[in-house]
Amino acid sequence: MEIELKSFTPAEQATFRLRALYEGAGYRKYRASRFEEYALYQEYQRFLPDSQVITFTDLDGKLRAIKPDVTLSIAKTAQPAAGECKRFYYNEEVCRPSRESHTFQTIHQMGLESMGAVDADEQAAVVRLALQSLAALDVPTVLEVSHMGYLTGLLDALNVPAEARARLLDFLRAKNAHELRTAALDTGLDDTAAAALTGLLDLHGPLGATLTKARAACLCDAQRNALEELQVLQNALGEDGRGTQLDLSMADEMEYYNGLVFTGYVAGIPRAVLKGGRYDYLMQRFTPGANAIGFAMYLDELERLAAPLPPVQQQGGEKSWLNIALPKGRLGDKAYKLLAGAGYSATEDYNDTRRLVVENPDACVRYF
């Protein structure tokens, strides 16, 4: 009896396809315990997405935690020998705090880890598997890559104080050029250095073209080395890497990743469905001299693909209008100017008219 995949949810379909993909590439399934000793997460807290975990005292008196991360457990037990590369894949649930609900939630992850002798070829093979994982979803997807060495090299070249970096990185993650520049100047950087930081936000686009643009902005060897590694990756991927994007402003989880990082997106899903990269520093805490790279797919996000469209997207041929309530004063003027600059200006200036509502029928935008 044959079972059609179409009868399963998007997440279930992905599970079947990814399992076949990973096992075909030589990865062995890792089965993690639901609980780990809390001491593991306490010691490696800075490598976790969030320091909050659910703990309990087990029957043997030990303090344990409901697993918030799979990679730590694999890194602890892998212990690859010198020159050996161990490859694992997993299909597990982790428990983490939700920023939206401010409660703990279970997150269904499926991913893989390559640990030990990770060279340029192994790194390219993992990125190729990430691209194939996205392609297995049968929907439009895109993979963005970056390199932590380019960003940290710039911060070092500009002599940004360690205590000031967290604030600057927050604005960089938020893609807020104005606040990033202001914070850089407040830190004591000059206009040229501030411009170099905000310039990171412009280093985003097709991999090849953005590499060329980034080379012209390099200030140190660390940045040039990072770009060379990305060039080697592009060459190794060849046609498989077509459509890959480069975003050198990517600054997520810098405590965790130390080199290549990548993020996958799916059309119709607002958050990333895939995250991964190099985490050599973490791996070397368990096995000196070893390197590691891996990624995880967030299968819960895929269920959005099966959710019905919101009413505004079910209107057939009718136009969907964007209604914007502008605040009074300079804040409203600034917001309108930004929107107008993006092509959403009204047919008449809302400041010069007595009308309470102005609109642009072509852009389907209305201001109050």
Where are each of the predicted segments found?
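Short, basic, glycine/proline-bearing loop/turn elements
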Residues: 1-4, 216-219, 268, 357-364
